[in-house]
């Protein structure tokens, strides 16, 4: 009898404690799997501790599709990997406009004009997102040792880079590792090259017209920019394995070969993603480094993700404003392996990771004069930016100098037929 009473009392106390101690989730955030997820979740824990709001982060391989197919989900805040997805969800009335969550004054003080424009719907004229993170594309990576061996040249423009390449290139001394093969997505790296050339040679106005599909690829600025890719990849003895290798070998090989003493290449043209594929036994600044795509301008092409709101209440509004605040991520950025670069231009917390810090410096300069531009291929209609443009550039590189220069008008006209 005593044992039975003890068990009943024990169960009552346990259940009561569990009931009163349990706090339901107040705000659910959903988004992609990300590097440094553990550090992001620690930042969410800091918000929990300061506000008393319980937060949960859920990962999805395709958050945009999930939200479309689950229109009545419990998700309160979503991180969308590209601005096109943001406007798509906004026009479907799945996410809310920013004017319900953040003041116009705050948005203007935190974000460049361009970052606000590309999350604004052309249909409703409403902005549906606030950028969270940014990553640069416009980088030239190099082997520190090999770079010293060729005299540590400095370049003020792409033309200077081409001239040096032409003068230096000789048999068995290929200067560039430029593999771009990426399965069904082969061509996306070449679109990054094209974007760098257009932005830095023709400026933000032409770049914006092209990304908005207001000018055709057959028009001179774009056609000439494609041929400027050819001036690099078709230079004799300039590219490891020649132009034929470029579209046939996986892009991850670039960074292994770049730091291989038995491979001659000094440079590789890529973005932030290169850091994911550098050999683990090699160190930044000691073994490899980068410089911005050469230009007298601060212009940078990059990518990033966007914070959006689905369900409005005071808890969600408070958490959202904490996420975009200039103080967010202070602990995250203090870690030596942090890859977090805030899109908020006022967030200038110390970044311990030297690569991330150097990348952030370039991004801040470009944001300050509104010359940061989002990856154009991701702003275009998907049948163009994620298909026809990839195919066109892959074919252009593969067919070689004579045919490419002869058939460039046919290639661009075929591309324009998708507009």
Task: Outline where the language-model segments fall.
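Conserved C-terminal helix/tail region of periplasmic/extracytoplasmic solute-binding proteins
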Residues: 353-419
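Hinge/lid segment of periplasmic solute-binding proteins
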Residues: 82-138
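Short helix-initiation/N-cap motifs at beta->coil->alpha
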Residues: 58-67, 242-256
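Extracytoplasmic/periplasmic solute-binding protein
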Residues: 128-132, 162-214
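Conserved N-terminal structural module of periplasmic/extracytoplasmic solute-binding proteins
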Residues: 1-87, 403-406, 413-419
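Short, solvent-exposed loop/beta-turn-alpha elements that line the ligand-binding surface or hinge
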Residues: 99-110, 184, 200-224, 278-281, ...
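Extracytoplasmic/periplasmic substrate-recognition and gating elements
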Residues: 126, 278-343
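Glycine-centered hinge/linker elements that transmit conformational signals in sensory
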Residues: 208-247
């Amino acid at each position: 009898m005593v044992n039975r009473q003890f068990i009943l009392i024990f169960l009552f106390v346990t259940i009561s404690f569990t009931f009163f101690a349990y706090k339901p989730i107040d705000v659910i955030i959903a988004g992609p799997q990300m590097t440094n997820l553990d550090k992001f979740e620690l930042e969410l824990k800091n918000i929990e501790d300061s506000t008393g709001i319980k937060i949960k982060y859920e990962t999805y391989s395709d958050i945009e599709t999930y939200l479309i197919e689950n229109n009545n989900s419990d998700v309160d805040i979503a991180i969308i990997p590209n601005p096109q997805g943001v406007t798509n969800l906004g026009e479907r009335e799945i996410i809310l406009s920013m004017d319900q969550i953040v003041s116009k004054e705050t948005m203007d003080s935190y974000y460049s004009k361009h970052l606000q424009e590309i999350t604004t719907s052309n249909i409703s004229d409403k902005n549906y997102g606030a950028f969270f993170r940014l990553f640069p594309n416009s980088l030239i990576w190099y082997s520190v040792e090999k770079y010293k061996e060729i005299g540590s040249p400095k370049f003020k423009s792409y033309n200077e880079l081409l001239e040096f390449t032409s003068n230096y290139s000789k048999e068995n001394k290929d200067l560039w590792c430029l593999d771009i093969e990426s399965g069904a997505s082969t061509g996306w790296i070449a679109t990054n090259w094209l974007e760098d050339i257009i932005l830095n040679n023709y400026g933000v106005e032409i770049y914006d017209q092209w990304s908005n599909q207001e000018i055709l690829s057959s028009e001179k600025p774009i056609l000439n920019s494609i041929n400027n890719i050819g001036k690099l990849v078709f230079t004799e003895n300039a590219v490891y394995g020649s132009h034929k290798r470029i579209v046939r070998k996986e892009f991850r090989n670039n960074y292994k070969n770049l730091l291989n003493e038995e491979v001659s290449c000094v440079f590789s043209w890529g973005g932030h993603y290169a850091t994911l594929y550098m050999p683990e036994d090699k160190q930044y600044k000691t073994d490899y480094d980068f410089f911005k795509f050469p230009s007298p301008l601060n212009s940078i092409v990059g990518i990033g993700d966007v914070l959006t709101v689905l369900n409005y209440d005071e808890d969600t509004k408070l958490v959202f404003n904490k996420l975009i605040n200039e103080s967010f991520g202070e602990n995250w950025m203090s870690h030596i392996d942090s890859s977090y670069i805030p899109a908020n231009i006022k967030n200038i917390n110390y970044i311990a990771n030297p690569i991330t810090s150097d990348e952030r410096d370039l991004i801040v300069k470009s944001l300050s004069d509104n010359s940061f531009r989002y990856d154009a291929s991701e702003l275009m209609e998907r049948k163009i930016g994620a298909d026809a443009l990839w195919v066109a550039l892959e074919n252009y590189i593969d067919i070689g100098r004579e045919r490419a220069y002869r058939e460039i008008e046919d290639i661009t006209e075929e591309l324009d037929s998708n507009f």
